[in-house]
């Protein structure tokens, strides 16, 4: 139980490496109000699953002839098994060097009979495989096995393309860096006041440790909320009833980023702007009728999303009115 006067702090209460090879971490953040805990319970998992990036194979173009799009002559594994093996390969590199670039191309060019492994892949400069002996395919005949691979930065919510034909290649569903996120809230009283502790359970692959993922997600959220200060203020009016009206626009952002900012602003405005304030003199509404002089600083707000296309990509704009 934390003293609310000390401010909220993170604590790592458990850390482990599981037999499956995954890393596990359990974290606690307290003290929090109910609104704060609710906001972070929604926002942190979204940030972990959408904003933590890693390098992965996302597409494979196989030169060998496929039989009914299921098997390759002279190779023991099915096509589906081979694609899954590519998806399991963990790639490492300095991610900041690859942000906004790519996709990148890698080549697997071997001749059987042999066991093709991750070390056999020719990778672009700056990218390495973590486990060189990771199995790809068993080539049982004296034939070449040639695969052109696409490498991209992906998150835990990234999905391979669908409807790709044999001529164009095959999509790969990559193993995500964040395997799973669970949250829970525990309530407690401190000197008669209710407070809450947020618990966060994170499972990751070997790309990143849970505490590193949490730190990155927290920075992403902070940076995302900082965008609000860059909102364009394109309409302002002082109403006859003494209220002020403003319209703001913020762009570009992804749908996930919009949803989190929308939730954060709604929660923050409802929580932090709800204190009572006395207005000197009579107060009237737009029709001139008298209203209660005790009112909240922010009387009303509305946040909407506008989608638009840019260079084939879909982005969102946030429109807010206060």
Curated annotation (Swiss-Prot):
What are the BP-aspect GO terms? DNA-templated transcription
Any one Gene Ontology cellular component term annotated for this protein: mitochondrion
Alphabetized UniProt keyword annotations:
Chloroplast, DNA-directed RNA polymerase, Nucleotidyltransferase, Plastid, Transcription, Transferase
Mind listing the GO molecular function terms for this protein? Answer: DNA-directed RNA polymerase activity; protein dimerization activity
Q: What is its EC number?
A: 2.7.7.6
Function statement: DNA-dependent RNA polymerase catalyzes the transcription of DNA into RNA using the four ribonucleoside triphosphates as substrates.
Subunit record text: In plastids the minimal PEP RNA polymerase catalytic core is composed of four subunits: alpha, beta, beta', and beta''. When a (nuclear-encoded) sigma factor is associated with the core the holoenzyme is formed, which can initiate transcription.
Q: Report the protein name in the record.
A: Putative DNA-directed RNA polymerase subunit alpha-like 2
Q: Which organism is it from?
A: Pelargonium hortorum
Q: What is the lineage of its organism?
A: Eukaryota, Viridiplantae, Streptophyta, Embryophyta, Tracheophyta
């Amino acid at each position: 139980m934390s003293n609310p006067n000390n401010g909220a702090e993170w604590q790592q209460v458990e850390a482990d490496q599981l037999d499956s090879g995954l890393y596990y971490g359990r974290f606690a953040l307290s003290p929090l109000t109910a609104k704060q805990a609710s906001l972070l319970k929604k926002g942190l998992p979204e940030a972990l699953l959408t904003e933590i990036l890693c390098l992965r194979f996302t597409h494979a173009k196989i030169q060998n002839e496929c039989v009914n799009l299921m098997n390759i002559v002279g190779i023991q594994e099915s096509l589906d098994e081979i694609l899954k093996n590519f998806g399991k390969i963990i790639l490492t590199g300095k991610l900041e060097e690859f942000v906004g670039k790519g996709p990148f191309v890698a080549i697997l060019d071997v001749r059987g009979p042999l066991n093709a492994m991750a070390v056999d892949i020719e990778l672009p400069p700056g990218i390495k495989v973590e486990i060189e002996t990771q199995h790809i395919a068993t080539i049982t005949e004296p034939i070449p096995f040639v695969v052109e691979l696409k490498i991209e930065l992906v998150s835990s919510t990234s999905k391979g393309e669908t409807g790709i034909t044999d001529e164009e290649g095959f999509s790969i569903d990559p193993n995500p860096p964040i395997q799973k996120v669970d949250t829970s809230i525990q309530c407690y009283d401190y000197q008669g006041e209710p407070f809450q502790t947020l618990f966060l359970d994170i499972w990751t692959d070997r790309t990143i440790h849970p505490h590193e993922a949490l730190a990155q997600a927290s920075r992403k959220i902070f940076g995302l909320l900082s965008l609000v200060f860059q909102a364009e203020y394109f309409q302002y009016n002082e109403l006859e009833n003494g209220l002020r009206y403003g319209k703001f626009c913020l762009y570009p952002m992804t749908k996930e980023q919009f949803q989190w900012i929308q939730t954060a602003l709604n929660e923050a405005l409802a929580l932090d702007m709800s204190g009572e304030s006395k207005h000197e003199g009579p107060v009237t509404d737009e029709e001139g009728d008298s209203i209660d002089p005790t009112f909240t600083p922010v009387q009303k707000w509305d946040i909407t999303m506008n989608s638009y296309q840019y260079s084939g990509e879909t982005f969102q704009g946030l429109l807010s009115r206060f």
